[in-house]
From Swiss-Prot:
Protein name (record): Chlorophyllide reductase subunit Z
Gene symbol of the encoding locus: bchZ
GO biological process: bacteriochlorophyll biosynthetic process; photosynthesis
Organism: Rubrivivax gelatinosus (strain NBRC 100245 / IL144)
Pathway it works in: Porphyrin-containing compound metabolism; bacteriochlorophyll biosynthesis
Region spans: Disordered: 460-487
Subunit structure: Chlorophyllide reductase is composed of three subunits; BchX, BchY and BchZ. Forms a heterodimer of one BchY and one BchZ subunit.
Length: 487
């Protein structure tokens, strides 16, 4: 399949983002000169706001000699000479180094090797393996059983690991802050956030948790399975979060109901207020679409469509190990254009191609990488109760934007041609032209169908009159809509 507009990176990026997220581990990239500039310097500046050279990375800087004749071992020794000999190090290979058998660790060094398989695996598949690799290399060989709750000292809180936060993950700080808030809200404590913020010396402490929360569907589950503890998927949506808290409370021997009740009157209150406000008239007809990683695509669609009843035009999930058919995504955006589109820079481009036409300008809400968008502040969650409120709030703001784009500017009204006076009757329409008009209006959100119909009808009659045509034909209407004539 020919893939346009890639929506994820190769495995080498996933390994780098996981290994650099954990403290105490030096990373050697075995690749050509400058191979770290894109993933570790440029992209992380536009996604995680990291300054250049923030991460503990050394590059072998392969040249023509190494690639064509000498191999990578000599370059590896040079890279090793600038490392701190007292700290562990891991070498990851880019696709070029993999093709020539690179990544071989020189004898007498403490560098360990991790093979990203960047030719075969994508960013999420490799991140999944990299997290497990950290545990398999620096964790415990035998996992002890946790002490039963009734045998623990009074007042000792149960513990939870949050698995998944790493670099290059959309909206991670806000979602992490919300999951931490939920865990602590029902009376538990966060044992470790892994790998981001953890130290290599503390990897063994992952077994000190009673439950693991896997933040993402794309990666992290391999480690959760290896830790031999119950694990839950981080929730998106109001009812999903309630179910998550109740199951977490059951596993931790805690009562989550007091916290849930407080949340209804605090964090969740804006949802009720928005639901009962003037925007309630639009909720049943304002459609949306989403193209994002599987975590967000599944969660946001379930929340907005199943829990709230908003009409969904399409939901496309980007899954680990599967290539997204972006050509069909582009077609969906063009033919089933929603009033609100959640997506990445790719979908924003496809949406920009549909700017001509009538009715409102669709609103775009970032929900995925790729794209240059920094979310270091913790006030934009999609997960948990705070995420449910944020999503409804942003959806309402998108509706206001749509209304803004429907209303004409006064300066535009002053610039248009005067409205020609009508004869006794309007210009007649062919039956086929009427059908094209009806089909077009039916595809518009109910919110703007009357406006769209009037705009198209007036323009078709005006241009037909200017061309000296006695009737409005289907060809004239299709021309205005940018549609091709049927074969």
């Amino acid at each position: 399949m020919y893939v346009i507009d890639h929506d994820r990176a190769g495995g080498y990026w996933g390994a780098v983002y996981v290994f650099t997220a954990i403290k105490g581990l030096q990373v050697v990239i075995d690749g050509p000169v400058g191979c770290e500039n894109l993933p570790a310097t440029a992209v992380l500046h536009y996604t995680d706001a990291l300054p250049p050279h923030e991460l503990p990375i050394v590059v072998t800087g392969l040249g023509e000699e190494e690639l064509g004749r000498e191999g990578t071992e000599g370059a590896m020794k040079r890279a090793h000479s600038v490392l701190d000999p007292d700290l562990p190090a891991v070498v990851v290979t880019g696709s070029i180094a993999e093709m020539i058998g690179g990544g071989v660790t020189p004898e007498g060094t403490t560098i360990q090797r991790f093979l990203p398989r960047t030719i075969d695996e994508d960013q999420w598949q490799c991140a999944n393996r990299a997290m497990f690799w950290l545990w398999s290399e620096y964790g415990l060989r035998k996992i002890p059983q946790r002490t039963p709750f009734e045998q623990r000292p009074a007042g000792e809180k149960p513990r939870v690991n949050i698995i998944g936060p790493s670099y290059g993950t959309f909206n991670m700080p806000s979602d992490l802050a919300e999951i931490r808030r939920l865990v602590e809200g029902i009376g538990a404590e966060v044992n470790m956030v892994f790998p981001l913020g953890s130290h290599l010396a503390d990897v063994q402490k992952l077994v000190d948790a009673d439950v693991n929360v896997c933040m993402y569907r794309e990666f992290g589950r391999m480690l959760c399975e290896a830790l031999e503890r119950p694990y839950l998927q981080a929730p998106i949506g109001m009812h999903s979060t309630t179910a998550f808290l109740r199951e977490l409370g059951r596993l931790l021997n805690l009562d989550p109901e007091p916290f849930i009740e407080r949340e209804k009157h605090t964090t969740l209150k804006p949802i009720w207020d928005l639901w009962r406000s003037v925007t309630q008239d639009f909720f049943g007809t304002a459609n949306f679409g989403i193209v994002a990683g599987e975590t967000y695509a599944r969660g946001v669609r379930h929340f907005l469509e199943d829990e709230l009843g908003l009409p969904c035009n399409f939901a496309v999930a980007r899954k680990a190990g599967e290539k997204t058919d972006n050509e069909s995504v582009r077609e969906l955006v063009h033919t089933k254009t929603p009033l609100v589109l959640f997506g990445s820079y790719n979908e924003r481009m496809y949406l920009a191609e549909t700017t001509s036409g009538h009715g409102p300008k669709p609103a775009y809400i970032p929900a995925s990488f790729p794209g240059a968008i920094i979310r270091r502040h913790t006030g934009t969650p999609f997960m948990g109760y705070a995420g449910a409120t944020y999503l409804v709030q942003e959806f309402c703001n998108a509706l206001f934007d749509a209304l803004f784009n429907i209303l004409p500017l006064g300066t535009e009204l002053d610039r248009i041609d005067a409205t020609p006076s009508r004869r006794g009757d309007s210009r007649p329409w062919d039956d086929e032209a009427q059908q094209v008009l009806r089909d077009y209006v039916a595809r518009q959100p109910v919110l703007v169908q009357i406006s769209a119909a009037k705009q198209l009808r007036d323009r078709a009659e005006r241009e037909a009159g200017a061309a000296g045509e006695e009737r409005v034909t289907a060809s004239r209407v299709r021309q205005l809509l940018g549609q091709k004539e049927p074969a």
